[in-house]
């Protein structure tokens, strides 16, 4: 019995052993190896099928597998070496197309089992996607084919269409196309447009070579395949919708990239639609720097409720800023700064698949060093759990894969965080980090302060969508997810390997499987939905293995089957409910929580739901403020349009409040009692974000009760609202291109209105502010300065304000507190007080630099007076240079008058510092000029230094007796390639009367000649000089007529002409007698103003002789310097206060005048002195009495022909300022003043003219006689209508047209032709001055400039001796009388070039461009405005097999560098052939500057 028991026990043990062995064997995966000659251009699965396609582009062969890649065979029915590209249908999983380079192509309808040929007349175009498909299941067989037609050497792209997947005869649809796409081609782009709507980017003209001018490219649409219906999409901007670079459908947005043809800086514009009908412009914050430029922005992977765009803020940079839009893609906010990208436009950004709100990105931690001194990038990885609102570092795992502690502290995220390689360094096919496996994220990276190299990286896993991480294996591995994440597979990607590692329990434990041969892994893929247990491993085999086994090819595909590793299929008990976002990490996105059913970690089973994507479940949340947005659907597209159907229905955000942009329309039948207390139910201004599913909670979109008095009035009416401030106004300013205005009061409070003064709110009631600054280069940014280190800033036009800490309190040394950079809107310079507390003896000013808008500061220098960025809008200095006026001896108290050096520091003052000048009075930037006032210590005299690049300076040369070393001077504005300087000629100091000579420079700002003498200035250095806005070359001055008498008396009588800031002060003596002069040729000649014949009452003037003229008050008599004669929106119109007589009368004795033709003729419009303001581009002008308190204003809608009165107050108000939005395009005005009877306060009166008329003016450029505009040209007193040597025509509204202009795109001036040169195109040369006969004569005691033959070095055939005249720099006249040319002399050596030289010079640009262009066209597939989208055949940089990552929605602009490359080559070759010409081509002009700075009084006043 015992023996039996023993035997039975032995058999039992043996049985268990066999069972254990069989189980163990069952847990191992299986594999099969297939060989190929070349790596694949593409490998893809037909979605939800077992069929796989392998395309060998090198050999032109196509291979098909019907068993998930286990076995392969060549595609049946396709000839060998013929396939150029293979494209699968994105929706019909049976269809795919194999295109050749010819006209015969192939189609499969059974997932690659069989292929049938079809023919199209033209070969496929070399674009990323030559086929476009329809997303409607009923029309899946609709296909658009883009081909290239060649007629001789002329080639252009054409589009064909088929309604039966090419079983029918393809029909030609459109020629000269760039891209065609069905409007219904993306399932997320849901709209009710016509089912056959097609968009095409196409050209309406081509050159003889077949090329297309970008200006001819437009977006067309059709609903009948362009048979009879062909519509130009005007994008809401009419004729300006030209220059379309690309069109794409991204998520639920249709996007058009448009190049602004009116600019030369390559700026792009983005237009977006969500319904395929209405288009709106995408608006970005900090508009001047977040510009969309060619090859400088990428549309990244986007959600259905937000569009993501990464923008390069600096030219030639690979550092961007990520912006995310509102729900309709029109308004963008900054999400993440310093994003990493590469030259191809790929951005290190990816959303975690299937998990709302979670995304990963890489940022450049040392962006300043990278851009400043080209340092290597230090990348850091960031993650967001709330759709980009907040970003944080990736939490580092505490231990490595062996359980050892990592060598840093994970609680210190600055020094110890996880950083992962991303899109710019792809290491596998498909998505970088995630897959449809719920919540599983993997990556290759390093732990530390920043990302290490790929070779030093390890492999990490997160099972909770990136919240926590663990290291799963050392070294870099490729990875893939299978069976909904229940299988994880990794393979070494750094070295040769013969094994894989896999985990069946979400990375808890790992096993190894050896597949028998050594490979270098190049790809690991599975079914796109990650539901299969089969994987494909692509690799390169070693030569040794190929020699051992002759069946092995250079490339192998290893089929890995994990089906037998587990026997049981999971049941319901094997699953957990996994929530996509953890508690405390903003669980709700778009109004709901999200969860998936996911297999438990230790469940020993397979999911087995093949081809069934993991299903996300939603639980709705209660509504909060984050579920609503402001009703600004079209507001940002119509900034200043006053059309009732647009902006008046909209609301603006003011902090947490939602305020109407203006009076809103009321429902019919309400507000009929004319009772101011009557109320109605109106819009709250909020709406739930489209697609948001929240329920209950806050209901911000419900109607609210409002007073009828706030509703819109009847048409033809004017309305106003009044707001009382408790303190006088000391500062006010609009945000540029906005309806938001800030006001600072004497009590140091700041108030904001987001609707042009209609409503007001106080900002931060408990704070006191000493100033506010608007960002000079970013329209949406402003800064509120307190007396402490704390300051407030906004990046969204005051919709929200945030606090930041400065390095020290604002300075008390009269230096500007903040300076801004034109290159990067986050770059700031702060100048503050240091060691200035009571009792300190070394109080001084310090300047600090921030590259993150105040988040972190770096010391620039101590003991400074003025620090600024060297670069400016038109001054192309080094963007990283900072220039400072720095005290030479830095000790003790900083005092005024201390000796200042001018120091330039490279690398944002952290690199090499160089002293430009050892003793300076000040510096300033004017347009393209950097002007420095230097002090010569030996002679104690001033010297003017001018630079065009911030590096090279030249001394200003002045006529004798007019050197700045003996005179005070004021540098005036420059807009016409020349500097104007006022040189004070009086010797007696103020308050003695002041006047001087106006000098004008040549185009380099170095040689100055006399423009006009005796120009008036006041004791503060301000000059009666003003240029007309919008018409270059027109300027007005006031000259002192009685200088001889004043010079003898040396004084000025009390009283005078001004209003407190004018030319007069306190000393008894002769009063200045001022006369006005105007120039229409940039200061060459000056004339009196022609007086009107009669006054505003129809009476003749008392002064009627030839000595009578119109004289007007200028800059020195102006209370508000912003109240200029002219407006940028009303071309040719000027208003002024003055009188007709022999000289200018006091301000209180003056009347109000208008000119419509640039100052040639004038009319008196009203008696008494008035302030004025332009609105709606000049279609409305209002004037308000400026002599005494008033209760009404006057307005005209016909430029002064008729005037109407509007009463705005019951009590009289002393109006101190009248303002409109900066562009003068709004019909709402704002009056500031003080009210009689109220002491210590002030009042703001909002006057709304939007209901005067509802008809918008019609502009018809094609038929100018049948619209509301006329063509007008400023006229010289001659036959030709020329100004600056050219006849220029402008559109202006017909004077009595009863319509409003609104926000119609401004029509650029038309240059009809250049005129022949006449006397008015010339001015006096250096050392010459005009005599009484208007001739240029040599100043006694001086000599002419020597002759200059340097033009010969520029390739000219002749050089000319100098004359007393020089051509006005801004003139473009041709031929005619050339007063600037004396005797002609032939240049030496011009005819000596060999024939071969000229052949090279002529032929090389064309040959080189053709060569480069052909190579680029055939190889890159990006010679057009292509848009790389998921699933396209897009080569990702660094990808061995040429397959893109498949996740980037990349909208790449057209690269315009072919001509530049040819030019470089030509310059190089020509320099080798003729060094002399090459060297002479570089002149002095090195740089461009500031167009806002107006006056330099030995300090920068901008």
Curated annotation (Swiss-Prot):
A Pfam family matched in the record: Sortilin_C
Transmembrane parts of this sequence: 1395-1415
Glycosylation sites: 328, 1004, 1314
Superkingdom to which the source organism belongs: Eukaryota
Keyword NADP: no
Per-repeat ranges for BNR: 63-74, 106-116, 460-470, 502-511, 792-802, 1078-1087, 1153-1163, 1195-1204
SMART domains tied to this protein: VPS10 (SM00602)
Side of membrane Cytoplasmic, spans: 1416-1502
Lumenal side: 27-1394
InterPro entries: Sortilin_C, Sortilin_N, VPS10, VPS10-sortilin, WD40/YVTN_repeat-like_dom_sf
Main location: Golgi
N-terminal signal peptide: 1-26
GO terms for biological process, alphabetical: Golgi to endosome transport; Golgi to vacuole transport; protein targeting to vacuole
The keyword Glycoprotein is annotated on this UniProt entry: yes
Subcellular localization: Golgi apparatus, trans-Golgi network membrane; Prevacuolar compartment membrane
Bilayer topology annotation: Single-pass type I membrane protein
UniProt keywords, alphabetically: Glycoprotein, Golgi apparatus, Membrane, Protein transport, Receptor, Repeat, Signal, Transmembrane, Transmembrane helix, Transport
One Gene Ontology CC term in the entry: Golgi apparatus
Function: Functions as a sorting receptor in the Golgi compartment required for the intracellular sorting and delivery of soluble vacuolar proteins, like carboxypeptidase Y (CPY) and proteinase A. Executes multiple rounds of sorting by cycling between the late Golgi and a prevacuolar endosome-like compartment.
Family to which this protein belongs: Belongs to the VPS10-related sortilin family.
Name by which UniProt lists this protein: Vacuolar protein sorting/targeting protein 10
Annotated source species: Coprinopsis cinerea (strain Okayama-7 / 130 / ATCC MYA-4618 / FGSC 9003) (Inky cap fungus)
């Amino acid at each position: 019995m015992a023996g039996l028991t023993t035997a039975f026990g032995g058999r039992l043990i043996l049985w268990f052993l066999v069972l254990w062995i069989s189980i163990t064997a069952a847990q191992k995966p299986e594999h099969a190896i297939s060989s190929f000659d070349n790596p694949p251009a593409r490998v893809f699965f037909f979605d939800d099928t077992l069929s796989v396609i392998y395309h060998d582009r090198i050999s032109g062969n196509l291979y098909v597998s019907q068993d998930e890649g286990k076995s392969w065979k060549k595609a049946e029915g396709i000839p060998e070496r013929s396939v150029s590209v293979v494209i699968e249908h994105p929706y019909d999983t049976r269809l795919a197309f194999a295109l050749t380079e010819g006209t015969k192509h192939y189609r499969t309808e059974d997932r690659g089992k069989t292929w049938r040929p079809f023919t199209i007349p033209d070969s496929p175009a070399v674009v990323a996607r030559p086929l476009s498909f329809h997303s409607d299941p009923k029309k899946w067989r609709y296909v658009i084919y883009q081909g290239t037609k060649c007629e001789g050497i002329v080639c252009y792209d054409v589009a064909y269409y088929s309604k039966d997947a090419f079983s029918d005869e393809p029909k030609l649809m459109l020629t000269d196309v760039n891209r065609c796409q069905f409007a219904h081609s993306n399932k997320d782009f849901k709209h009710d447009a016509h089912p056959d709507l097609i968009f095409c980017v196409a050209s309406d003209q081509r050159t003889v070579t077949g090329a297309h001018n970008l200006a001819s490219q437009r977006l067309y649409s059709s609903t009948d395949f362009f048979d009879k219906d062909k519509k130009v999409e005007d994008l809401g901007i009419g004729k300006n919708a030209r220059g379309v670079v690309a069109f794409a459908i991204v998520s639920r947005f249709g996007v058009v990239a448009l190049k602004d043809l009116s600019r030369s800086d390559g700026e792009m514009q983005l237009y977006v639609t969500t319904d395929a009908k209405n288009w709106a412009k995408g608006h970005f914050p900090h508009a001047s720097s977040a510009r969309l430029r060619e090859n400088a922005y990428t549309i990244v992977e986007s959600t259905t409720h937000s569009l993501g765009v990464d923008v390069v803020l600096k030219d030639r940079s690979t550092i961007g800023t990520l912006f995310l839009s509102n729900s309709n893609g029109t308004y963008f906010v900054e999400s993440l700064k310093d994003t990493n990208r590469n030259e191809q436009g790929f951005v290190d950004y990816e959303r975690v698949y299937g998990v709302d709100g979670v995304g990963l990105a890489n940022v450049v931690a040392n962006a300043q060093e990278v851009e400043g001194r080209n340092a290597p990038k230090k990348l850091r990885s960031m993650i967001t759990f709330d759709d980009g609102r907040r970003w944080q570092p990736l939490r580092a795992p505490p231990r490595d894969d062996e359980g050892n502690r990592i060598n840093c502290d994970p609680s210190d995220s600055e020094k110890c965080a996880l950083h992962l390689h991303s899109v710019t360094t792809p290491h596998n096919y498909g998505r970088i980090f995630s897959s449809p496996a719920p919540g599983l994220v993997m990556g290759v990276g390093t732990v530390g302060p920043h990302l290490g190299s790929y070779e030093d990286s390890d492999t990490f896993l997160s099972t909770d969508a990136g919240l926590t991480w663990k290291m799963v294996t050392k070294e870099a591995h490729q990875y893939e997810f299978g069976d909904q994440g229940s299988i994880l597979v990794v393979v070494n990607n750094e070295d040769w390997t013969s094994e894989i590692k896999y985990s069946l329990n979400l990375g808890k434990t790992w096993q190894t499987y050896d597949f028998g041969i050594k490979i270098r892994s190049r790809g690991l893929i599975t079914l796109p939905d990650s539901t299969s247990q089969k994987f494909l491993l692509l690799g390169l085999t070693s030569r040794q293995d190929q020699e051992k086994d002759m069946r092995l090819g250079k490339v192998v595909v290893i089929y890995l089957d994990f089906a037998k590793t587990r026997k049981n299929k999971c049941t319901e008990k094997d699953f957990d409910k996994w929530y996509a976002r953890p508690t405390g990490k903003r669980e709700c996105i778009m109004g709901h929580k999200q969860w998936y059913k996911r297999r438990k970690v230790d469940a020993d089973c397979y999911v087995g739901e093949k081809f069934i994507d993991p299903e996300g479940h939603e639980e709705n949340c209660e509504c909060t403020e984050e579920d609503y947005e402001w009703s600004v659907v079209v507001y940002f597209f119509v900034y200043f349009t006053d059309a009732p159907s647009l902006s008046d229905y909209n609301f603006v955000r003011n902090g947490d409040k939602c305020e109407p942009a203006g009076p809103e329309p009321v429902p019919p039948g309400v507000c009929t009692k004319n009772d101011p207390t009557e109320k109605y139910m109106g819009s709250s201004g909020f709406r739930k974000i489209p697609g948001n599913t929240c329920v209950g909670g806050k209901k911000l979109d419900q109607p609210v009760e409002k007073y009828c008095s706030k509703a819109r009035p009847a048409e033809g009416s004017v309305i106003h609202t009044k707001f009382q401030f408790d303190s006088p106004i000391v500062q006010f300013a609009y945000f540029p291109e906005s309806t938001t205005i800030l006001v600072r009061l004497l009590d140091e409070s700041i108030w904001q209105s987001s609707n042009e003064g209609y409503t007001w709110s106080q900002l931060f009631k408990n704070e006191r502010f000493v100033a506010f600054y608007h960002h000079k280069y970013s329209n949406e940014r402003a800064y509120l300065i307190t007396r402490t280190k704390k300051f407030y800033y906004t990046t969204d036009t005051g919709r929200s304000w945030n606090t930041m800490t400065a390095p020290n309190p604002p300075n008390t040394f009269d230096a500007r507190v903040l300076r801004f950079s034109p290159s990067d809107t986050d770059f700031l310079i702060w100048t503050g007080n240091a060691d200035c507390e009571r009792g300190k003896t070394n109080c001084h000013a310090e300047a600090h630099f921030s590259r993150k808008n105040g988040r972190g500061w770096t010391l620039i220098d101590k003991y400074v007076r003025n620090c600024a960025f060297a670069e400016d809008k038109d001054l192309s200095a080094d963007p990283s240079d900072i220039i400072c006026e720095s005290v030479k001896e830095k000790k003790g108290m900083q005092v005024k008058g201390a000796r200042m050096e001018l120091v330039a520091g490279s690398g944002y003052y952290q690199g090499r510092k160089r002293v430009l000048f050892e003793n300076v009075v000040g510096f300033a930037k004017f347009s393209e000029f950097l002007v420095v006032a230097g002090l010569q210590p030996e002679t104690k005299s001033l010297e003017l230094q001018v630079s065009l690049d911030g590096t090279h300076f030249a001394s200003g040369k002045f006529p004798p007796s007019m050197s700045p070393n003996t005179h005070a001077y004021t540098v005036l504005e420059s807009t016409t390639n020349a500097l104007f300087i006022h040189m004070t000629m009086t010797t007696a100091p103020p308050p003695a009367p002041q006047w001087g000579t106006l000098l004008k420079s040549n185009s380099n700002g170095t040689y100055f000649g006399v423009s006009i003498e005796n120009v008036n200035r006041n004791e503060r250095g301000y000059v009666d000089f003003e240029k007309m806005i919008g018409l270059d070359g027109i300027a007005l001055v006031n000259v002192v007529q009685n200088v001889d008498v004043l010079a003898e008396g040396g004084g000025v009588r009390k009283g005078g002409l001004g209003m407190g800031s004018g030319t007069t002060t306190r000393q008894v003596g002769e009063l200045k007698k001022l006369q006005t002069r105007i120039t229409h040729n940039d200061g060459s000649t000056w004339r009196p103003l022609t007086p009107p014949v009669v006054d505003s009452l129809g009476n003749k003037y008392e002064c009627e002789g030839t000595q009578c003229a119109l004289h007007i008050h200028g800059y020195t008599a102006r209370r508000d310097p912003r109240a200029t004669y002219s407006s940028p929106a009303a071309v040719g119109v000027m208003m002024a206060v003055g009188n007709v007589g022999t000289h200018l009368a006091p301000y209180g004795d003056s009347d109000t005048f208008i000119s419509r033709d640039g100052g040639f003729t004038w009319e008196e419009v009203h008696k008494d002195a008035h302030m004025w303001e332009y609105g709606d581009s000049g279609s409305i002008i209002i004037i308000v009495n400026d002599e005494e308190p008033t209760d009404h204003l006057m307005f005209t809608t016909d430029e002064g022909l008729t005037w109407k009165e509007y009463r705005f107050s019951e009590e009289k108000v002393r109006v101190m300022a009248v303002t409109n939005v900066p562009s003068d395009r709004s019909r709402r005005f704002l009056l500031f003043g003080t009210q009689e009877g109220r002491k210590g306060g002030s009042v703001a009166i909002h006057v709304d003219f939007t209901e005067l008329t509802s008809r918008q003016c019609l502009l018809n450029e094609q038929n100018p006689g049948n619209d509301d505009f006329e063509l007008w040209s400023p006229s010289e007193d001659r036959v030709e209508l020329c100004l600056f040597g050219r006849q220029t025509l402008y559109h202006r509204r017909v004077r009595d047209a009863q319509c409003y202009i609104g926000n119609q795109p401004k029509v650029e001036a038309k240059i009809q032709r250049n005129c022949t040169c006449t006397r008015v195109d010339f001015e006096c040369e250096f050392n010459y001055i005009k005599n009484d006969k208007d001739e240029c004569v040599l100043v006694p005691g001086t000599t002419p400039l020597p002759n200059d033959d340097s033009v010969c070095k520029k390739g000219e055939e002749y050089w000319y001796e100098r004359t007393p005249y020089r051509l006005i720099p801004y003139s473009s006249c041709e031929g005619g009388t050339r007063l600037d040319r004396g005797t002609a002399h032939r240049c030496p050596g011009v005819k000596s070039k060999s024939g071969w030289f000229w052949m090279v010079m002529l032929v090389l640009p064309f040959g080189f461009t053709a060569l480069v262009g052909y190579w680029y066209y055939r190889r890159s597939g990006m010679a057009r405005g292509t848009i790389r989208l998921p699933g396209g055949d897009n080569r990702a940089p660094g990808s061995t097999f040429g397959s893109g990552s498949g996740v980037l929605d990349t909208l790449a602009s057209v690269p315009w560098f072919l001509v530049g490359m040819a030019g470089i080559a030509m310059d190089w070759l020509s320099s080798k052939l003729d060094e002399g010409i090459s060297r002479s081509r570089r002149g002095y002009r090195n740089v461009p500057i500031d167009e806002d700075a107006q006056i330099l009084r030995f300090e920068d006043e901008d």
